[in-house]
């Protein structure tokens, strides 16, 4: 099972501590701000409010804040031997092409990357370049579509909000795509339940969950 760190810490020491706890993959959220790729968890709460952005209960009206970084700066602190999950926060195929250029420029081989996103076209661009892609499933309509097998070709996995997952739904999903990733799971008992259901990986902010997943 893959233990995935939901957020990549802002120091190399904290990243190493997560790797020591069992995290094998570090997630970064990549969005494009005025055409520039930026690692950031701050997103508009609704499509009609592009100027207001939030990360949980933190809000900002600023176009860019200090917590938002270039991808290269984040990659520098991820421990050697760990993979990177780029959660692509755009449905623009041109942005996907830019992402491929960024990935190639790092010199890190495709085996060191996963790319998740919602848009089949964007994922197809990334997959065509040889990178592993995950379809991100967060809404009920997306989940129903995945249950019915409405998935893009060539996926390495689907990554699903964990509250949608139980024995029946995991079984149905795995008939269409054998690898199901659950996010974001911070309760150890829930991680144990999901592991017993056969998920292939768990995204978490909890080092105890990373330790458990890495032990499976």
Kindly label every feature range from the protein language model:
Residues 1-216:
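Phosphate-group recognition and catalysis centered on beta-loop-alpha active-site segments
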């Amino acid at each position: 099972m893959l233990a995935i760190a939901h957020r990549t810490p802002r120091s190399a020491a904290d990243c190493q501590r997560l790797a020591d706890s069992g995290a094998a993959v570090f997630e970064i959220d990549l969005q494009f701000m005025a055409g520039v790729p930026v690692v950031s968890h701050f997103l508009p709460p609704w499509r009609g409010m592009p100027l207001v952005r939030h990360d949980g209960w933190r809000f900002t009206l600023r176009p860019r804040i200090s917590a938002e970084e270039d991808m290269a700066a984040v990659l520098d602190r991820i421990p050697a031997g760990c993979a990177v999950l780029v959660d692509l926060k755009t449905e623009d195929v041109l942005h996907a092409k830019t992402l491929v250029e960024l990935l190639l420029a790092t010199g890190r081989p495709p085996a060191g990357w996963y790319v998740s996103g919602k848009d089949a076209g964007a994922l197809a661009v990334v997959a065509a370049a040889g990178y592993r892609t995950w379809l991100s499933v967060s809404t009920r309509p997306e989940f129903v579509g995945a249950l019915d097998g409405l998935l893009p070709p060539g996926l390495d996995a689907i990554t699903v909000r964990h509250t949608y997952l139980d024995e029946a739904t995991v079984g149905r999903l795995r008939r269409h795509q054998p690898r199901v990733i659950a996010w974001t799971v911070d309760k150890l008992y829930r991680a144990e339940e999901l592991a017993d259901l056969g998920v292939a990986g768990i995204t978490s902010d909890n080092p105890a969950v990373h330790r458990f997943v890495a032990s499976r």
